[in-house]
Regions:
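CheY-like receiver
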Residues: 18, 45-46, 101
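Short beta->alpha connector loops at strand-helix junctions that form conserved
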Residues: 3, 8-10, 37, 57-58, ...
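A structured beta-alpha segment of the ubiquitous adenosine-cofactor-binding alpha/beta core
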Residues: 34-52
């Protein structure tokens, strides 16, 4: 009776995956929860196994692959493939609170979470005030030189860094 699960953290964050494995092993028996660390080949091998359910969070291309492999065993799947997460701010909002929450959500893990705000839809009458409050909140969190603050997140790998550079300054 009961459920057990296998967790396969991202290979892009090996230190976090190692810590997760350590913490889980300290509080739960391995027959209940196992953490499997490894690269893409590890993920592919796991998908050859017959699970009762698969929950995947990541990008759409890998999501298609997960769905295809799960279908071979008729395994139900939940795919959390991200998307665009808008923030809507109207004049009735507490702008300071909105700014604080937007900055937290966007700057947590350098915005590299599937629920990070991607864009803001703001009522024109409060746009300027919101922008000023966002700048204040960023400075509160990271100081006047955010890039030299150790709490300011880093991009997970060179490929993502280069993609962002191309978005900012296309060739």
């Amino acid at each position: 009776a009961g459920n057990c699960c296998t967790l396969k953290p991202s290979e892009l964050a090996p230190a976090t995956a190692t810590l997760l494995a350590q913490l889980v092993s300290e509080v739960l028996p391995p027959e209940l929860v196992s953490v499997v660390n490894g690269d893409v080949t590890t993920s592919q091998a796991l998908l050859e196994e017959e699970f009762d359910y698969i929950f995947y969070t990541g990008n759409g291309n890998v999501g298609k692959y997960v769905m295809e492999k799960a279908a071979q065993h008729l395994t139900p799947v939940t795919l959390e493939l991200g998307g665009k997460s808008p923030v809507i701010v109207t004049r009735s909002a507490s702008l300071r609170l909105a700014a604080r929450r937007i900055v937290f959500g966007k700057f947590l893990n350098c915005g590299q979470t599937c629920i990070a705000p991607d864009y803001i839809l703001v009522e024109n009458s409060v746009k300027e005030e919101l922008v000023n409050l966002l700048q204040e909140e960023i400075e509160k969190m990271y100081g006047k030189a955010p890039l030299s603050n150790p709490d300011y997140g880093k991009i997970v790998n060179r490929r993502h860094f280069e993609r962002i550079c191309r978005l900012i300054a296309p060739e």
